Amino acid sequence: MRRGWKMALSGGLRCCRRVLSWVPVLVIVLVVLWSYYAYVFELCLVTVLSPAEKVIYLILYHAIFVFFAWTYWKSIFTLPQQPNQKFHLSYTDKERYKNEERPEVQKQMLVDMAKKLPVYTRTGNGAVRFCDRCHLIKPDRCHHCSVCAMCVLKMDHHCPWVNNCIGFSNYKFFLQFLAYSVLYCLYIATTVFSYFIKYWRGELPSVRSKFHVLFLLFVACMFFVSLVILFGYHCWLVSRNKTTLEAFCTPVFTSGPEKNGFNLGFIKNIQQVFGDNKKFWLIPIGSSPGDGHSFPMRSMNESQNPLLANEEPWEDNEDESQDYPEGLSSLAVESET
């Protein structure tokens, strides 16, 4: 009876958390919808008097708005990619691992299993990275997200504003979303500013439009400042081929810690996110190379790394491991043992 009550309570709490997790997204959507109304109707159709200026403003605005909304949608609804089945422990191995009471034997079991996989990163103490929640050996750059309750390939962070985990499958879309958000705010601020001055001087009569135009400039500038900082930080991460987690805690390889272990050079680092074909760089479609399980590494020479030597990868078995301190709990990453 008590167990059933606890299960019902736990299920109710999970349901409430899932519902509440959409609140930040709803806030963003409402702000964007209001900005659309304020710009299109109150500014362009009511305040702007020149027909040519109206047309130019509306065309440019909608071009930016489409890409802004498209990338936001892709960031939200592109599911995080999880490690494939070859990284999961079989039922027999799982039971053997769970029933083994000696830590040193458990560690050796993971070492033996990892020998079949292209795993080059380790925990802080040099052990194979293993997720005891998902029961798998983690691919390189893969981490467990406590919010999504899953291991995510090339996890960067969990973002409440898109209610999704940002990783290999959607990092390109997230970066594009930041870029188009900055452009969206900048465009609104620059085109609204002259009318803000006119309202401030009392040269325009409409009281209702005055409120929307003034507040629109304030909101656009506020979001622009915060977004340009975040976008600049992620541009720096891309230029170094790092994730947010790797920027906070240096990856540990079999040879030891190496903060530039995945740094291939500026151009190749960009291609690791956007792909080789530049015509897809500005469009939110999947073009990141690889399958998210293994990545070219600077710390390995071409004879050791099949991704740099253009050889066949290890039968789709690609994985990563690493430890992170408690200070990163706000990034929704479970500690690894």
Swiss-Prot record:
Residues 1-20, 78-172, 235-337 are cytoplasmic. In brain, expressed in both excitatory and inhibitory neurons but not expressed by glial cells. The active site is at 159 (s-palmitoyl cysteine intermediate). Residues 293-337 are annotated as: Disordered. It catalyses: L-cysteinyl-[protein] + hexadecanoyl-CoA = S-hexadecanoyl-L-cysteinyl-[protein] + CoA; L-cysteinyl-[protein] + tetradecanoyl-CoA = S-tetradecanoyl-L-cysteinyl-[protein] + CoA; L-cysteinyl-[protein] + octadecanoyl-CoA = S-octadecanoyl-L-cysteinyl-[protein] + CoA. GO terms for molecular function: palmitoyltransferase activity; protein-cysteine S-myristoyltransferase activity; protein-cysteine S-palmitoyltransferase activity; protein-cysteine S-stearoyltransferase activity; zinc ion binding. Palmitoyltransferase that catalyzes the addition of palmitate onto various protein substrates. Has no stringent fatty acid selectivity and in addition to palmitate can also transfer onto target proteins myristate from tetradecanoyl-CoA and stearate from octadecanoyl-CoA. Palmitoylates IGF2R and SORT1, promoting their partitioning to an endosomal membrane subdomain where they can interact with the retromer cargo-selective complex. GO terms for biological process: establishment of protein localization; peptidyl-L-cysteine S-palmitoylation; positive regulation of dendrite development; protein localization to membrane; protein localization to postsynapse; protein targeting to Golgi apparatus; protein targeting to membrane; regulation of dendritic spine morphogenesis. The gene is Zdhhc15. Residues 129-179 form the DHHC domain. It is found in: Golgi apparatus membrane; Postsynaptic density. This is Palmitoyltransferase ZDHHC15. Zn(2+) 1 binds at residues 131, 134, 144, 151. Zn(2+) 2 binds at residues 145, 148, 158, 165. Autopalmitoylated (in vitro). Keywords: Acyltransferase, Golgi apparatus, Lipoprotein, Membrane, Metal-binding, Palmitate, Synapse, Transferase, Transmembrane, Transmembrane helix, Zinc. It is a multi-pass membrane protein. One of its GO terms (cellular component) is postsynaptic density. It comes from Rattus norvegicus (Rat). Residues 312-323 have a biased composition (Acidic residues). The chain crosses the membrane at residues 21-41, 57-77, 173-193, 211-234. It is an enzyme of class 2 (transferase).
